[in-house]
Amino acid sequence: MSEKKIQLVIVTGMSGAGKTVAIQSFEDLGYFTIDNMPPTLVPKFLQLVEGTTDNDKLALVVDMRSRSFFLQIQNVLDELEQNENIDFKILFLDAADKELVARYKETRRSHPLAADGRILDGIKLERELLAPLKNLSQNVVDTTDLTPRELRKTISEQFSNQADMHSFRIEVMSFGFKYGLPLDADLVFDVRFLPNPYYKPELRNQTGLDKDVFDYVMNHAESEEFYKNLLGLIEPILPGYQKEGKSILTIAVGCTGGQHRSVAFAQRLADDLAKNWPVNSSHRDKNRRKETVNRS
């Protein structure tokens, strides 16, 4: 028997109810995910996974594709019930017929069970075939009035472990404005107004990770005041980002070249935030000037 049970979520429900958004949400929560897995392959897949991966959280989308679907999935569920190494839940996504029709018309896609092309007929047949599975589901979510963002938040609230470090993490990075803004930054702060160590010959070839540069940057009164205000701004808003279901928050601090001031500020910020949150720090342009000089 495995020391740690596999936590399996089977994502199913009405076509057009949001299974694609759901599986992306599970991926953000640290689950290993697979979309559109035939029910008959689930047991074989789980046999391969047991003991071969460090990730004990799996989410599989299982879709209705034929009239034999329920019989197939029922056999799978019976097998899972007998497996002591797996804890599983079924997440069933539903929505009102009118909303499902509107979504299909918006995407101009055909319903997989609409043999004659009529969307509503396909929806009615699918609802009839899925009714027994819906009754077996531990989690039923009606997405009729939910935006994709709200669905992500709902899934995060129901399935994320608050102690799980995968649920929300912070990326703090430094950069140089002369090399362009980071495309993935959520929050950007500019420290170009602070005294620049570049103009001190003894500091020019060092970076904000070196003590001499760090002390030079931080020992100015305006630096300390700005840093305290920056930390005071960021810390209170982090729970809000987590509550909204955001998986990664990228905070970027920039100076002219990304070697001195921004590096010192970003690293200090990362170290302080890491006292209460999972944080990773990086310095995009820290060595760019050195590399340019060496090539010339």
Swiss-Prot record:
Residues 277-296 are annotated as: Disordered. Keywords: ATP-binding, GTP-binding, Nucleotide-binding. ATP binds at G13, M14, S15, G16, A17, G18, K19, T20. It comes from the Bacteria. Disulfide bonds: none annotated. GO terms for molecular function: ATP binding; GTP binding. InterPro entries: P-loop_NTPase, RapZ-like, RapZ-like_N, RapZ_C. GTP binds at D63, M64, R65, S66. Residues 282-296 have a biased composition (Basic and acidic residues). It holds the Pfam family RapZ-like_N. HAMAP family: RapZ_like. Displays ATPase and GTPase activities. Belongs to the RapZ-like family. PANTHER family: RNASE ADAPTER PROTEIN RAPZ. This is Nucleotide-binding protein SSA_0810. It comes from Streptococcus sanguinis (strain SK36). The lineage of its organism: Bacteria, Bacillati, Bacillota, Bacilli, Lactobacillales.
